[in-house]
Swiss-Prot record:
Alphabetical list of Gene3D superfamilies matching this protein: Cupin
InterPro entries reported in the protein's UniProt record: Cupin_8, JmjC_dom
Lineage: Eukaryota, Amoebozoa, Evosea, Eumycetozoa, Dictyostelia
SUPFAM superfamilies: Clavaminate synthase-like
Record-given protein name: JmjC domain-containing protein D
Top-rank taxon, per record: Eukaryota
Ranges where the JmjC domain occurs: 305-448
Name of encoding gene: jcdD
GO MF annotations in UniProt: 2-oxoglutarate-dependent dioxygenase activity
Length: 448
């Protein structure tokens, strides 16, 4: 047995241990989903896996039947997790989708091993040569598992991806030579004249944790923090302003994007797309004269759980770990691993409608510039939220750029503050503070 097979089997064994340790069978029985156990038991029976035994001895079993069963299981669980509102779907089924994807990939791999070569180079490193058609199928299935699954199997899935991508080092230079040096085109940015009496407070010297907590978080005062991000790798040796770098790291991966003027628009839709294709079609080729109905952007996605290499390019501001509330221990801040990080990447002209979020927000601008207009929670009654909507109750009905004052008369006298957020700056937005955002250029931001 070669190195590649043995490493894959170890990861598969690890996923089975996770399955057992988290009592999937008991939970499925309790939720009256016993029919799913029929599929799972059939899969384990084909593999003849007893969790107490070593699965190495079963390497030569015929796995075609396993592929059919695991594929059917994936389809059934996929339908379950898309049968209702995403946030209300039981995490158990999201985890089960990820596990069934691992089962499918494992059986698929073992059938395809005859097409996979493993070479040792002079440095005793392992080069795994997987034909591109096979690699595309594998990466697509694993990306779907990361996108639609929960976090339980993420580490195993990313380790499998790293294993099959282990031969990238020798191919990176050839890959980069296949396209011209491409970067964001931000030469034609919109110029916005700000009201000097409505400017947000800017902090050039990052405050201490206690100072920031007491003066901004507890009091609910938004601000812009400057000079805090300049040491991040994404501004230096792994620069995100270089699209070649982003393509090299994530080019072959499948990512979810949104297409349309904004999330309230009737033509709004979602799409899964190859990252390279997204960059070429929606970032590089996009200009301000294009139809906004076809504008595409990557928004509020768990990109860094899916592609940990990009996660290593950023740092989490210590302010994000401050706890606010009764009984909180100032010395017991949240661990960095528990901080949820969303990514936003899109072209010039994209708009996020006026809305509020229930938690503390830190908008970290990495590439490009954004115009942002903020309204205090005290103005909520004058901002006309969608009160009758379960999805958009936190979003205003007012078009901030072209308000209809006859329909929304109270909006005209609302107090506000505004700013242009530049690359390298962090905007702190307190909970329930209303904010409208528009990209003045092609833009990459994160929200820890």
């Amino acid at each position: 047995m070669d190195y590649y097979q043995s490493e894959l089997i170890k990861l598969f064994q690890k996923s089975n241990e996770i399955y057992k340790d988290n009592n999937f069978e008991t939970k499925l029985n309790e939720k009256n989903y016993k029919f799913l156990l029929v599929y799972l038991n059939s899969i384990h029976s084909i593999l003849k896996i007893d969790m107490k035994l070593n699965i190495y001895q079963y390497i030569n079993i015929e796995f075609k039947e396993l592929i059919l069963i695991s594929k059917e299981l994936m389809k059934i669980v996929f339908d379950i997790i898309h049968s209702g509102t995403w946030n209300n779907i039981d995490i158990l089924f999201k985890d089960l989708f990820a596990y069934s994807s691992i089962l499918y990939i494992y059986s698929f791999f073992l059938i395809q091993f005859k097409n996979i070569k493993v070479d040792n180079n002079n440095n005793n490193n392992i080069n795994i040569n997987i034909p591109n058609p096979i690699k595309k199928i594998i990466l697509k299935k694993l990306d779907l598992a990361l996108i639609f699954g929960d976090k339980l199997f993420n580490q195993v899935i990313n380790q499998i991806i790293n294993l099959i991508s282990n031969n990238n080092n020798n191919n990176n230079n050839n890959f980069l030579n296949n396209f011209k040096n491409e970067n964001y085109n931000n030469n034609n940015e919109n110029e916005i004249i700000l009201n000097k009496e409505k400017l947000i407070k800017r902090i050039s010297r990052p405050p201490s944790l206690n100072e920031f907590k007491n003066e901004y978080m507890i009091k609910g005062n938004p601000c812009v923090i400057e000079n805090l991000m300049k040491e991040w790798p994404c501004f230096n040796e792994r620069n995100w302003s270089d699209l070649n770098y982003l393509k090299n790291v994530a080019g072959s991966r499948l990512v979810p994007i949104e297409i349309g003027p904004n999330y309230l628009h009737e033509k709004m839709k979602q799409k899964l797309i190859n990252f390279n294709k997204f960059i070429d079609e929606y970032i590089i080729s996009k200009n301000s004269d294009d139809d906004n109905d076809d504008i595409g952007y990557l928004a509020q996605t768990k990109l860094f759980e899916q592609i940990p290499q990009l996660r290593n390019d950023i740092l989490i501001p210590e302010y994000c770990k401050i706890k606010i509330g009764c009984g909180d221990d100032d010395n017991d801040n949240n661990k960095e691993d528990n901080v949820e990080i969303n990514a936003w990447l899109g072209p010039k002209g994209t708009v996020t409608p006026l809305h509020y979020d229930p938690k503390h927000n830190f908008l970290c601008q990495i590439v490009g510039r954004k115009y942002i207009k903020l309204f205090s929670p005290k103005e909520s009654n004058n901002l006309y939220p969608h009160l009758n909507s379960k999805l958009f109750f936190n979003t205003s009905m007012v078009d901030v750029e072209n308000p209809d004052h006859s329909k929304f008369p109270l909006f005209k006298n609302c107090d506000y503050i505004e700013l242009i957020l530049n690359a390298g700056e962090i905007l702190y937005i307190p909970p329930t503070y209303w904010h409208f955002v528009k990209s003045l250029s092609q833009s990459f931001s994160i929200f820890p």
